[in-house]
């Protein structure tokens, strides 16, 4: 079993841990009403997108999501939250050092005493969610689960759906397809972006991701019988009907969107195995991006 497979299978338990930390996280994270930025690279950026959309939709305050290199210089926030599994990503450390003095900063990481944790004013550690695989799965979803719990959400339905995602048959045979498109709305746009990245990293697949209602504004032109178009969360039935007319296989996600992402993780592992690839060590990638100063 690859490390990826083990880490994917552990997600329901990791989410239970996150749910139990909800009250603690609520105290550590910026208070409701604060104007904040959530910052990450790669997978962590996509989780930041989901966090920002959830926080705003819940009326908890204006929330922006950025990669560290794209934060608008001079823009003021009441607090900045960063997400970094390894705590070693150079751009995140630099972004924290560039935050105006007096602005609270919080790091979400799996590694204590890491450069990111040391650079932040405070931290929330998810050490049990750390991973051996270069490809992130459980750390990302556990961090998002932590935020959802801190916003007051009951995660028990999502955890039950994750158990289903791990045990029920996949909705299609992954090796029969060459092209994968993921659609999201609201907070699931970040998950769609992450789903597409997962298949690119783990199995070198041709993937795309879009806000659901934008898909027919051009991208649908390349959908065909070897395509899977997968909606993470609710999508308009008429859109899915239009996609089906292209000959593509349509998957209308019925589980909690985070649990749908767990199913995507399974697809990534199966496709990597079918292609003879090591999903734990994708080509050209390392656990984190550490730049020379």
Located regions from the model:
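Glycine-rich phosphate-binding loops that contact phosphosugars or nucleotide phosphates
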Residues: 34-160, 166, 185, 228-253
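Internal, active-site/partner-interface "lid" segment
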Residues: 111-112, 119, 149-177, 277-293
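A general structural motif
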Residues: 161-170, 207-217, 233-234
């Amino acid at each position: 079993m690859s490390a990826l497979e083990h880490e994917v299978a552990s997600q329901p338990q990791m989410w239970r841990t996150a749910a139990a930390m909800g009250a603690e996280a609520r105290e550590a994270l910026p208070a409701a009403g604060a104007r904040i930025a959530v910052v990450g690279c790669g997978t962590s950026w996509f989780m930041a997108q989901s966090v920002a959309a959830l926080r705003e939709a819940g009326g908890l305050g204006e929330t922006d999501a950025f990669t560290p290199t794209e934060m608008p210089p001079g823009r003021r926030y009441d607090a900045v939250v960063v997400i970094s599994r390894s705590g070693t990503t150079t751009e995140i450390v630099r972004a924290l050092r560039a935050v105006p003095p007096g602005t609270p900063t919080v790091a979400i990481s799996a590694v204590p005493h890491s450069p990111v944790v040391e650079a932040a004013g405070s931290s929330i550690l998810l050490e049990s969610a750390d991973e051996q695989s270069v490809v992130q799965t459980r750390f990302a979803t556990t961090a998002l689960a932590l935020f959802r719990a801190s916003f007051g959400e009951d995660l028990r339905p999502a955890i039950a759906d994750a158990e289903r995602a791990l045990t029920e048959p996949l909705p299609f045979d992954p090796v029969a397809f060459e092209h994968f498109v993921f659609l999201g709305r609201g907070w699931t746009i970040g998950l769609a972006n992450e789903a597409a990245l997962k298949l690119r990293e783990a199995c070198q697949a041709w993937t795309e991701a879009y806000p659901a209602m934008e898909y027919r504004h051009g991208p649908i032109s390349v959908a065909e019988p070897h395509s899977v178009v997968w909606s993470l969360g609710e999508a308009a039935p008429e859109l899915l009907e239009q996609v089906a007319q292209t000959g593509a296989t349509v998957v209308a996600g019925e589980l909690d969107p985070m649990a749908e992402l767990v199913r995507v993780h399974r697809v990534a592992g199966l496709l990597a195995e079918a292609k003879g690839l090591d999903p734990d060590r994708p080509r050209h990638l390392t656990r984190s991006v550490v730049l020379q100063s």
